[in-house]
Curated annotation (Swiss-Prot):
Name the record gives this protein: 1,4-alpha-glucan-branching enzyme
Domain of life assignment: Eukaryota
Task performed by this protein: Glycogen-branching enzyme participates in the glycogen biosynthetic process along with glycogenin and glycogen synthase. Generates alpha-1,6-glucosidic branches from alpha-1,4-linked glucose chains, to increase solubility of the glycogen polymer.
Assigned GO CC terms: cytoplasm
PANTHER family: 1,4-ALPHA-GLUCAN-BRANCHING ENZYME
C-alpha cells in the first residue's frame, strides 16, 4: 500500500483507494505543479503577484495621466504604439524590447493630469518582423474593442479610460460567505429578450435579473462575455481575453449589471474560455508577433481540428501570466465570483477527447495521453483563485470523468469545486429520441443521476445551451414539437402530447434537481419550456435573429400554458432553498420498479415519489421511509397551478407503519397518479 502523504499529491488516495496503481502519476503531476509554482515564487514574487499581470502589462495609467504600454511579442524586431492620438504615426512612440521579449513605451501626459491618449480612441501596436515586414495588431491586454460594419468586420482596439465621474463605482463586493445549494441560471446577455436584436447589459440588468431572483436561482453563469468577433460562436471563439463584449454595451454597464446581481444576493460566474482561442489574426492573438508559436503550440499541436481554433502552450511562462492574470482581472475589475471553465476535457488530454469514449477505466486518465502542462495550469489557476478569494466557485466542463478533478490541489487534486454532469442531459435526449415511455428503465435513470464520484461535487442539469443549439432542440420541443405552435393556449384543447409534455418536463427537471447532484443548472428560457432551438444570425440563416432570443413574453401571456412550467420552476427552487437537499448527503433510493415505472427516494428529510408510468395511477401504493411519523404533502407536480389535474389532496395526511419495506424501517401508503411527482415531509 502506498504511504499517503499530504505533500506529494497522493492524499487523494484517502478518498479513492482505486487510484493506488496510479500513485506514481499523481506524484509526477503534483511535482510538476510544485516545480512551476516554485519558478513563479522565485522569479515573480509568488502566485498572487504573478497573476496581477493586468496591472503591469497592456496600458497602465499613472496619476499624472502618463501611459505606460507593455506587450509581449518576442519575434518582433521593432515595435511602436500607433493610434488616433498620434495620427497613426510610426515614429512618434517607438518601443524598447526587454531580454524577455516584452516591448515597452511611455506616453507622457499633455499636461499634468491630462492623458495624451483620449478616452475610447483607437490604438494599435505596429511591429516589424525579422524579414522586414510590418504588421499591426490590437494590444492583447486591451479592455475594449468595437466593430463598425460600415467600415470593416475587423474589430478596433480602444483605449478605455473614462473620466472619474463616468467610471462605475461598485457598491457591493464579492460574497462574504460560501454559496450553499448552488442553483445556476445559465444566461447569454445578447439573446435575453424577445426582440429580434442583440440585448444589452442594461436591459439584462433591468429586465432579466429580477426574473432570476424571483425564480429562486442564487447564481448566474454568464456566457459570451469575453469578446468574440464571431457572434454565432456563442462566445466560444474568443479574440480579446480582457475585453467585455461591446455588442452588449460598455465595460461600465457590465460592472453595473454584476453589482446589481450582488445587490439581489446572486453569485455571478463567468464562462471562461481558456481551452482555445479564435484563429483570427487582425483582431485576435493568433500569429500575434508574426510567429506561429507566441501564445500557442506550433504546428498541428497548436490547432484544434474540430473547433478550427488555436491551442495554448500552457508550459510557456508568459502564457501562464496571461491566463492567470485574466482570471484575476475578471474577479477584481468586474467583481465576478468565479468561473465555469469551458472545454476542460480538451485541455487535459492531448487527443482533446476526440474519438475517445472514456469507459471509466482509470488508465484513461493517466499516462501519455494526458497533457501535463495543461493539468498544471488548471491546478495553478484553482490554487491561485482559492487562496486569493475564499468563496470563489470554479466549475469544470469535463465529459471524461477525470478522477480528482474536484479535490483540493493540496491533496493532489485539480482543485475545482464542481464538475458538470454532462451525461445527464444526454440520457434524456436519448430516451426521448429512441424509446417509448413504457421502455424507460427506472434503474438506468437512477444510475445516470447518481453515478458521480464520491466527495467530488457535481452540477446536475436536464439541459444547457448545448442541447438547444441548431441541429438539436430544447427538451420541451423534443416532448411536444410542433403541437407547441397550436396547443399551448389554455383556450385550446389539452392534447395528449401537450399533457404528456407538460407532465414530463416538470418531472425530468425535478428528478434531476433532487437526485442528480450537489448543484443544479438551467439554461435561460428552459424554466418555462422554451420552444424550438438556438441559432445565431449567420450567413446560413440570412442573419436572422428569430432563434437568437428568449421569448419571455410566452410566460407573461397568462393565457398560455408556459406559465405552468415557469411556476413549477419557482416552486422547485424555493423548496430547495427551504430544505437544502443540494447540500445534503446523496439520496437513499428505496425503489426502482420497472413494471410500475416508480422511483422513490429520501433526501434532506423529504420523501420523493415519482410515477413515470404513462397511464397507470396507483391507489394505496406502499413506499418505504426511514423516519416514522405523520407525513403531509409538501409539493406535487399535479397541482392546478402547475398545469396538473389536481388528483392529489393537498391536505392529505400519511401515517407510517413500523414495518420494514424496501430496506426502510417504516412504510406508508399513497395515491400516486401517473406522470406525477409527490413530495412528502414531516
Amino acid at each position: 500500500m502506498t504511504a499517503v502523504s499530504l505533500s506529494d499529491g497522493t492524499a487523494v488516495l484517502k478518498t479513492d483507494p482505486w487510484l493506488e496503481p496510479f500513485s506514481g502519476a499523481l506524484r509526477e503531476r503534483y511535482a510538476a505543479y510544485q516545480k512551476q509554482r516554485t519558478i513563479i515564487e522565485e522569479h515573480e514574487g509568488g502566485l498572487a503577484e504573478f497573476s496581477k499581470g493586468y496591472k503591469s502589462m497592456g496600458f497602465q495609467i499613472d496619476k499624472n495621466g502618463g501611459v505606460r504600454y507593455r506587450e509581449w511579442a518576442s519575434n518582433a524586431t521593432e515595435a511602436r504604439l500607433i493610434g488616433e492620438f498620434n495620427n497613426w504615426s510610426h515614429t512618434a512612440n517607438p518601443m524598447t524590447k526587454s531580454p524577455f521579449g516584452v516591448w515597452e513605451c511611455y506616453v507622457p501626459p499633455v499636461s499634468p493630469g491630462v492623458c495624451a491618449i483620449p478616452h475610447d480612441s483607437m490604438v494599435k501596436i505596429s511591429m516589424t518582423l525579422p524579414g522586414g515586414e510590418s504588421i499591426d495588431r490590437i494590444p492583447t491586454w486591451i479592455t475594449r474593442v468595437t466593430q463598425d460594419l460600415n467600415i470593416s468586420p475587423i474589430y478596433d482596439g480602444r483605449f478605455w479610460n473614462p473620466p472619474k465621474e463616468q467610471q462605475y463605482q461598485f457598491k457591493h463586493g464579492h460574497s462574504t460567505r460560501p454559496v450553499e445549494g448552488l442553483k445556476i441560471y445559465e444566461a447569454h446577455v445578447g439573446i435575453s429578450s424577445p426582440n429580434m436584436r442583440v440585448t444589452t447589459y442594461k436591459e439584462f440588468e433591468v429586465d432579466v435579473l429580477p426574473k432570476i431572483k424571483q425564480l429562486g436561482y442564487n447564481c448566474i453563469q454568464m456566457m459570451a462575455i469575453m469578446e468574440h468577433a464571431y457572434y454565432a460562436s456563442f462566445g466560444y471563439q474568443v479574440t480579446n481575453f480582457f475585453a467585455a463584449s461591446s455588442r452588449f454595451g460598455t465595460p461600465e454597464e457590465l460592472k453595473s449589471l454584476v453589482d446589481k446581481a450582488h445587490e439581489l444576493g446572486l453569485t455571478v460566474l463567468l464562462d471562461v474560455v481558456h481551452s482555445h482561442a479564435s484563429k483570427n489574426i487582425l483582431d485576435g492573438i493568433n500569429m500575434y508577433d508574426g510567429s506561429d508559436h507566441l501564445y500557442f503550440h506550433e504546428g498541428g499541436r497548436g490547432r484544434h481540428d474540430q473547433w478550427d481554433s488555436r491551442l495554448f502552450n500552457y508550459g510557456q511562462h508568459e502564457v501562464l501570466r496571461f491566463l492567470l492574470s485574466n482570471l484575476r482581472f475578471w474577479m477584481d475589475i468586474y467583481m465576478f465570483d468565479g468561473f465555469r471553465f469551458d472545454g476542460v476535457t480538451s485541455m487535459m488530454y492531448k487527443h482533446h477527447g476526440i474519438g475517445s469514449g472514456f469507459s471509466g477505466g482509470y488508465h484513461e486518465y493517466f499516462g501519455d495521453s494526458v497533457d501535463l502542462e495543461a493539468m498544471v495550469y488548471l491546478m495553478l489557476a484553482n490554487a491561485m483563485l482559492h487562496e486569493t478569494y475564499p468563496h470563489v466557485v470554479t466549475i469544470a466542463e469535463d465529459v471524461s470523468g477525470m478522477p480528482t478533478l474536484c479535490r483540493p490541489v493540496a491533496e493532489g487534486g485539480v482543485g475545482f469545486d464542481y464538475r458538470l454532469s454532462m451525461a445527464i442531459p444526454d440520457m434524456w435526449i436519448k430516451l426521448l429520441k429512441e424509446y417509448t415511455d413504457d421502455q424507460w428503465e427506472m434503474g438506468q435513470i437512477v444510475h445516470n443521476l447518481t453515478n458521480r464520484r464520491h466527495l467530488e461535487k457535481s452540477v446536475a442539469y436536464a439541459e444547457s445551451h448545448d442541447q438547444a443549439l441548431v441541429g438539436d432542440k430544447t427538451l420541451a420541443f423534443w416532448l411536444m414539437d410542433k403541437e407547441m405552435y397550436d396547443f399551448m393556449s389554455d383556450l385550446s384543447p389539452l392534447t395528449p402530447i401537450i399533457d404528456r409534455g407538460l407532465a414530463l418536463h416538470k418531472m425530468i427537471r425535478f428528478i434531476v434537481h433532487t437526485l442528480g447532484g450537489e448543484a443544479y443548472l438551467n439554461f435561460e428560457g428552459n424554466e418555462f419550456g422554451h420552444p424550438e432551438w438556438m441559432d445565431f444570425p449567420r450567413e446560413g440563416n440570412g442573419n436572422s435573429f428569430a432563434h437568437a432570443r428568449r421569448q419571455f413574453n410566452l410566460v407573461d401571456d397568462k393565457l398560455l400554458r408556459y406559465k405552468y412550467l415557469y411556476e413549477f420552476d419557482v416552486a422547485m427552487n424555493w423548496l430547495e432553498d427551504k430544505y437544502k437537499w443540494l447540500n445534503s448527503p446523496q439520496a437513499y433510493v428505496s425503489l426502482k420498479h420497472e413494471g410500475d415505472k416508480m422511483i422513490v427516494f429520501e433526501r434532506a428529510g423529504l420523501l420523493f415519489i415519482f410515477n413515470f408510468h404513462p397511464t397507470q395511477s396507483f391507489t394505496d401504493y406502499r413506499v418505504g421511509v426511514d423516519t416514522a411519523g405523520e407525513y403531509k404533502v409538501i409539493l406535487t407536480s399535479d397541482e392546478t397551478r402547475f398545469g396538473g389535474h389536481n388528483r392529489i389532496d393537498m391536505g392529505g395526511r400519511y401515517f407510517t407503519t413500523p414495518m420494514e419495506w424496501n430496506g426502510r424501517k417504516n412504510w406508508l401508503q399513497v395515491y400516486s397518479p401517473s406522470r406525477t411527482v409527490l413530495v412528502l415531509g414531516l
